A protein has these predicted regions:
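N-terminal, charge-rich alpha-helical recognition modules
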Residues: 1-61
């Protein structure tokens, strides 16, 4: 399995913590405000990020 980059991990952690706002998670992770919406959407299509989010969400169940 591929590993998350530090920025991808920060995105995923912020996405979980903010209740699922991908744009805000991208900005918090360090993506530019200009590209945050696009990068948030792209990150949610990456299996490695989705897998990490799913594993983290199990901790809350």
């Amino acid at each position: 399995m591929d590993k998350l980059t530090p920025k991808q991990k920060a995105f995923a952690d912020n996405y979980i913590e903010n209740g699922g706002n991908a744009t805000a998670a991208a900005v918090s992770a360090g993506y530019s405000k200009r590209s945050a919406q696009q990068m948030g959407a792209e990150n949610l299509l990456k299996p490695v990020i989705l897998g990490y989010i799913a594993e983290r969400q199990k901790e809350y169940d």
